């Protein structure tokens, strides 16, 4: 089984909400994945195509007519599926893709509006992002998957897991959300956030990205990530943010069958 390679699995039950949440450490064979080689020259890696790792780049068309880009390495019908976070792309998974593809079939997906996927989605939602992931997995006729989501990719893989049912063996949240007790914002609060984002897009984006880093973060790496986030079209960033803020997390987690 795929999950046998994970060193530690924590299952936390939030009794007050009667929901399940899986928090799984990224430990393989009892050792942390090392990114030291990546950190030696992170910008060179981030600017290099994932195909250099032996991945094949393919795409499908989503239900709403958006081209969804993904990368795959391996032929097993049991796979690790990586989903990036807000304003990111599959390239951000470079060290993990390099490491895990040595022993597993690995897939990395660019959700709509991100990476090399299409920009023509009309309405952004977590359901739509989850459907992007689901569509790739069903297109490849995979039998069993471990879904791994970074940051915003966490709620995206929850949506995908609900679509996939028994095909999903585990969900792995990497630096994703931990306060899942709220149902999402609406009304005035939603309007206020969207208005502020429209008026102060660049400064709000820069401030939020700067909060990602610590004092020891490589300056070139921080600059690359900041500039990459600012390249995203405003309507996509705003639509994605709105999807994040309006998702009903407790309801989605209750639906998990894992």
Locate the predicted segments by residue.
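Short, hydrophobic alpha-helix immediately C-terminal to the catalytic nucleophile
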Residues: 94, 134, 158-162
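Alpha/beta-hydrolase fold catalytic core
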Residues: 8, 13-80, 103-104, 143, ...
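Active-site loop/oxyanion-hole signature of alpha/beta-hydrolase fold enzymes
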Residues: 63-66, 71, 108-148, 152
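Conserved alpha/beta-hydrolase catalytic His-Asp/Glu region
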Residues: 182-188, 198-255
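Flexible "cap/lid" loop of the alpha/beta hydrolase fold
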Residues: 159-162, 169-199
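Short, conserved loop/helix-junction motifs that constitute active-site signature segments
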Residues: 100-101, 253-257
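Conserved catalytic-core motifs of eukaryotic protein kinase domains, centered on the activation segment
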Residues: 92-93, 117-122, 183-184
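Conserved HGGG/HGGXW glycine-rich cap/lid loop of the alpha/beta-hydrolase fold
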Residues: 66, 72-116
């Amino acid at each position: 089984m795929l999950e046998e390679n994970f060193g530690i699995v924590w299952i936390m039950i939030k009794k007050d909400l009667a929901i399940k949440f899986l928090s799984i450490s990224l430990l393989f064979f009892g050792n942390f994945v090392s990114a030291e080689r990546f950190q030696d020259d992170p910008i060179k890696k981030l600017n290099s195509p994932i195909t250099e790792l032996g991945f094949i780049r393919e795409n499908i068309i989503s239900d709403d007519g958006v081209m969804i880009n993904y990368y795959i390495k391996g032929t097993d019908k049991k796979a690790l599926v990586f989903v990036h976070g807000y304003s990111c792309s599959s390239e951000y998974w470079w060290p993990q893709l390099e490491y895990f593809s040595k022993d597993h079939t690995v897939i990395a997906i660019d959700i709509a509006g991100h990476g090399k996927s299409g920009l023509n989605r009309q309405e952004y939602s977590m359901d739509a992002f989850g459907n992007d992931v689901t569509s790739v997995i069903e297109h490849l006729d995979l039998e069993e998957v471990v879904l791994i989501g970074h940051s915003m990719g966490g709620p995206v893989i929850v949506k995908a897991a609900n679509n996939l049912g028994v095909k999903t063996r585990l969900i792995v949240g990497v630096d994703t959300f931990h306060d899942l007790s709220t149902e999402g914002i609406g009304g005035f609060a939603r309007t206020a956030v969207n208005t502020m984002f429209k008026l102060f897009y660049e400064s709000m984006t820069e401030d939020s990205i700067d909060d990602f880093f610590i004092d020891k973060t490589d300056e070139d790496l921080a600059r690359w990530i900041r500039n990459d986030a600012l390249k995203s079209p405003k309507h996509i960033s705003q639509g994605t943010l709105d999807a994040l803020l309006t998702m009903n997390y407790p309801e989605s987690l209750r639906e998990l069958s894992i």
